């Protein structure tokens, strides 16, 4: 999972960074938070995390907190998917916290709905996939009030600031749910105006949803449009 996280870090130009644990601890996103000093600058990133002897993780400093929450659910989905593929199961769908991967031998594609963030049990889009995954990251999930401002758990690793726009969703389709999960987390940390252009430049299947009250705006990368049900 560390190796996959570093791959996603590279794919997002560093916007997905597993060394942001200290920022979340400082802001209060973890119940068992430690006492740490305010962080204004950092001299390390995910690039400084190394693996040796197969599974030995080496950190640049002892106080670096590795946070895998932005990729762990997708990784778990892939583990289950790979296990089920070894069994005589015709079709299955795995869903862990909204990170989904499907397999079907009965049909070429499986229809999935992308949830409407403003209404329960309704969809804003339908997609057709098979042996692929879709993962979604939202700034409206896991928020808290920090120094008088409502902030998201999503952190911009370039500025070390948590995203304050709580009306964003990013969905990514990829053959690996691990990668889709990490990409969605990294992309949503970017400036919203750059997400689709970055996705197009890097052939990422991305859907950006901006919502407020009952108003919804949807934007698609060219790669994502291949999966939209007409």
Predicted regions, residues:
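Mature catalytic core of soluble alpha/beta enzymes
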Residues: 1-230
């Amino acid at each position: 999972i560390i190796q996959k996280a570093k791959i996603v870090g590279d794919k997002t130009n560093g916007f997905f960074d597993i060394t942001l644990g200290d920022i979340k601890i400082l802001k209060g996103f973890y119940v068992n938070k430690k006492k740490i000093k305010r962080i204004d600058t950092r001299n390390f990133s995910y690039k400084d995390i190394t693996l040796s002897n197969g599974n030995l993780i080496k950190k640049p400093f002892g106080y670096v907190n590795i946070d895998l929450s932005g990729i762990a659910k997708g990784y778990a989905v892939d583990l289950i998917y790979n296990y089920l593929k070894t069994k005589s199961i015709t079709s299955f769908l795995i869903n862990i916290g909204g990170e989904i991967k499907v397999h079907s031998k009965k049909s070429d594609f499986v229809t999935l709905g992308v949830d409407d963030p403003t209404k329960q049990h309704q969809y804003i889009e339908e997609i057709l996939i098979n042996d692929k995954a879709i993962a979604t990251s939202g700034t409206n999930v896991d928020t808290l009030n920090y120094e008088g401002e409502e902030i998201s758990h999503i952190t911009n690793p370039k500025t070390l600031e948590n995203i304050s726009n709580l009306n964003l969703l990013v969905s990514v389709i990829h053959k690996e749910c691990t990668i889709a999960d990490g990409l969605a987390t990294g992309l949503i940390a970017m400036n919203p105006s750059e997400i689709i252009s970055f996705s197009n430049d890097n052939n990422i299947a991305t859907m950006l949803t901006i919502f407020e009250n009952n108003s919804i705006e949807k934007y698609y990368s060219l790669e994502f449009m291949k999966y939209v049900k007409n």
